[in-house]
Swiss-Prot record:
A lipid is attached at C25 (S-diacylglycerol cysteine). It comes from the Bacteria. It holds the Pfam family TraT. It is found in: Cell membrane. Responsible for preventing unproductive conjugation between bacteria carrying like plasmids. It is a lipid-anchor. One of its GO terms (cellular component) is outer membrane. A lipid is attached at C25 (N-palmitoyl cysteine). Residues 1-24 form the signal peptide. The keyword Lyase does not apply. This is TraT complement resistance protein. It comes from Wigglesworthia glossinidia brevipalpis.
Length: 239
């Protein structure tokens, strides 16, 4: 029976090569392009702060997502210190407050299940299952074998990280704090005064940061460091 298993694996590789040649260069080029990690980060609205000689900053970073990401505060502190800012642990002493929350980290798998190669592999697997004389254990081995091949080529994984950011700056002018509310399913946003908000001498600026990581068979830990670097850079460059 072992001979049949090895023979089937050899035949599967031949089918794989033939199907790949039928697909052409486009799929191969796509795989080659996605073999390296690619991370992009952008802020959906620019924040402009007033110039000030007071360079004290209070930093608060939270993570309410379902994944661990904990190096952002340290990186922001390091970058701002290199720019001449003083980091304080007491918010009442700070001219600037940086308040960030990692709101959501989600994985999206882009699997090309409709392409010719995937169809060929599935069809061949179906033929193997109907080969006389092979027991269930052997079928499981074939299943694992084809699953490894399919996953290695067709799981183009993406991670999306959403970060809410609020930066405030002390001012001599008494101002009211505005809150943002979602009005409908299209997520139109309107500024309305929250009756519970207190007037104070601070200007508040809100925005959102989006980070995208992409690579074939990407695991989050592979992209974590670069995502932290880019989010930290994006926030620090406001100053």
């Amino acid at each position: 029976m072992k001979f049949f298993i090895e023979l089937n694996k050899f035949r599967l590789i031949i089918v794989f090569i033939v199907c790949t040649s039928l697909i052409g260069c486009e799929t191969i080029n796509t795989f080659v392009k996605k073999r390296n990690l690619e991370v992009n980060t952008y802020m959906n609205k620019t924040i402009y702060l007033n110039p000030s000689e007071d360079k004290t900053v209070y930093i608060q970073v939270k993570n309410t997502s379902n994944r661990e990401i904990n190096g952002i505060k340290t990186k922001i502190s390091s970058i701002l210190k290199s720019k001449g800012y003083l980091i304080t642990y007491y918010p009442e002493e700070a001219n600037y407050w940086i308040q960030a929350n990692i709101l959501r980290i989600e994985q999206i798998k882009l699997e090309n299940k409709d392409n010719l190669l995937h169809h060929c592999l599935e069809q061949y697997l179906d033929d193997i299952h109907h080969t006389p004389g092979l027991c269930n254990k052997e079928n499981e081995e074939e299943n694992n074998f084809i699953e490894k091949i399919s996953k290695s080529f067709f799981e183009n994984n993406n991670f999306i990280v959403v970060t809410d950011l609020q930066i405030s700056q002390r001012t001599n002018i008494l101002c009211s704090k505005f809150d943002r509310f979602h009005l409908n399913s299209k997520e139109k946003i309107k500024n309305v005064i929250n009756p519970k908000s207190k007037e104070g001498k601070r200007n508040f600026y809100k925005t959102r940061i989006y980070s995208y990581a992409n690579k074939v068979n990407l695991e989050f830990y592979e992209a974590k460091k670069e995502i932290e670097n880019q989010i930290s850079h994006s926030i620090s460059e406001v100053f």
